[in-house]
Amino acid sequence: MKRGIRHFPRLWRASRLARRWYYARAGAYPDWRSLIEPEAELWQSARAGAQGGPRVLMATAIGSYAHAATLESALSAALTFRGAEVHALLCDGSMTACAECDASLYPDLSRFAEHGPSQDLCRNCFSPAESVYRQLGITVHKFSEWLGPDDRAEARRIANTTPANEIQAYTLDGLVIGEHAYAGTLRFFATGALDDEPMAEPILRRYFESALRVAFATRRLLKSIQFSSAVFTHGIYVPWGIVGEVARQEGVHVSTWNVAYRKRRFIFSHNDTYHHTLMSEPREHWEDVELS
């Protein structure tokens, strides 16, 4: 059935959006409240004991990544029991494009070039993940809280005036911005090159503007609140690649993760992404491990 629907782009889009709407309301996210209630006193004691401990930022960012909100909220609970003061970072509609967007959702690409995800994907993104973290009593930071009007204007100015052929190599104060914006655009089109993609330039500029916004907001957050570590998925694209760039520059330890190739396992990489650490990890760390 899925293959059949894909032959009808507008029907495919409608089914995807309907599925997102349903999952945001029906069981795709953990119900921490029901887990905490039987041991409420224990959890409150753990939370109180964690205040003032090492601060860890769960930069989930994209709330509709239910699997990310699930794992990162579980890590939040585990770290709280171990004395860490955990905060979360979510986008509340501030990004102009992100890793949740892809061309198959937009049969009319000009619509995305003009509006981005603001008229559809953003509607069911922030609230479910915020609810997950609020159930745990974790402080939730929104991109909009750390992004001022001047930041938005500057991001728009840079994105509109930088020559298209210079975007990929663009850096800001030593931060690799353009590379992640370009990678995000490639991901949007599910391609290895943008040369033959319709609307490639305006969509690249939209990802570029979004990357700049994420950089401005994340930098202000990390300069205002001292975090010892930041945890998030992938470590590339927009927003996670940009969050990683800023965190490393600000001296915050970065831990990225992705779903592993073995069932019910995850790959964690420190201060880099699994794309690199899978190639550079010393073989002696695993070659003699007895696998079940």
Model-derived features with residue positions:
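Short, well-ordered alpha-helical microsegments
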Residues: H67-A68, E72-S73, V238-G241
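Conserved N-terminal ligand/cofactor-binding loop architecture of enzyme catalytic domains
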Residues: M1-R55, A59, A78, R82-L212, ...
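A short, glycine/small-residue-rich beta-strand->loop->alpha-helix junction that serves as a flexible
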Residues: A61-L71, F232
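Conserved nucleotide-sugar donor-interacting segment of glycosyltransferase catalytic cores
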Residues: V214-S269
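Short, solvent-exposed amphipathic alpha-helical segments in soluble enzyme
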Residues: S73-S76, A247
